[in-house]
């Protein structure tokens, strides 16, 4: 009978242990996340990019997407509440006018910003770079849509079209694009596009502070 070298079972154990630790990490990019709270903390720490199908536009800077893992398609019959089967994303670095909520009148251009965003994103598959999770358990993201070869940044487009100003409150994140955002905001303001056409204007932050 051949004697098995002592290092072989040790190697087999080490390989098995390594695979046991590695496989869960390899599976995560292909796992579907039902809510933002399902997304691992390290995905935010490393600013991972995910993708999903837009199923609802809440307002000009908030959407709900059904996460679509890489190598999967966006089709499928999903049942259940949107709050339990979708990710709520807050578009990073911008603030759109508030829409009417809870019996309170909305701001000028709030509905227009929402309608524009819905026209651009509804039922589309988008990619989104995770920056942070906010106090409302929303994923604050840079959202991209359109051609894979020349994707458009939602934050930039909202600023370009005068449907948002730069978000400058506590906890603001820009994904390294603040200078770009400032240039786009300044250009829209100079052209008096949409929100910048108003002679007297209240920012969304000022509006919310009046509650």
From Swiss-Prot:
Compartments (UniProt record): Secreted; Host cytoplasm, Host cytosol
Lineage top rank: taxon: Eukaryota
Enzyme class: hydrolase
Limits of the TNase-like domain: 48-198
Glycosylation sites: 153
PROSITE patterns with a match to the protein in the record: TNASE_3 (PS50830)
Leader sequence residues: 1-20
Family the entry assigns: In the N-terminal section; belongs to the RxLR effector family. In the C-terminal section; belongs to the LCL3 family.
Protein name per UniProt: Endonuclease Htp3
Organism: Saprolegnia parasitica (strain CBS 223.65)
Organism lineage: Eukaryota, Sar, Stramenopiles, Oomycota, Saprolegniales
Name of the gene encoding the protein in the UniProt record: HTP3
